[in-house]
Amino acid sequence: MVSIRLSRGGSKKRPFYHLTVTDSRKSRDGRFIERVGFFNPVARGQEERLRVESERLNYWLSQGAQCSERVAKLIKDAAAAA
């Protein structure tokens, strides 16, 4: 099954996450199909906290991809803010 979930990057104590479309059997930070955005939980000032390529995200959702709980919440928050 294809899932849309967060993949961790960044350094120690400074997390940064990519929203990735991946096979659910792969590891968290392993091989992915496509990156569709990012989430920066420690963004300050003018830094961008969340970016989602909504066109690609909608494509994958139409193909049957399942979002993780956290990604679903981020998408909902992004839609409310826009």
Curated annotation (Swiss-Prot):
Keywords associated with the record: Ribonucleoprotein, Ribosomal protein
Any GO MF annotation of the entry: structural constituent of ribosome
Pfam families, alphabetized: Ribosomal_S16 (PF00886)
Keyword Ribosomal protein tagged: yes
SUPFAM superfamilies: Ribosomal protein S16 (SSF54565)
Recorded GO CC terms: cytoplasm; small ribosomal subunit
InterPro entries for the chain: Ribosomal_bS16, Ribosomal_bS16_dom_sf
Annotated family: Belongs to the bacterial ribosomal protein bS16 family.
Coiled coil: none
Xref: NCBIfam families: S16
Protein's name in the database: Small ribosomal subunit protein bS16
Organism encoding this protein: Saccharophagus degradans (strain 2-40 / ATCC 43961 / DSM 17024)
One of the GO BP terms on file: translation
Disulfide bonds: none
Top-rank taxon: Bacteria
PANTHER family, alphabetized: 30S RIBOSOMAL PROTEIN S16, SMALL RIBOSOMAL SUBUNIT PROTEIN BS16M
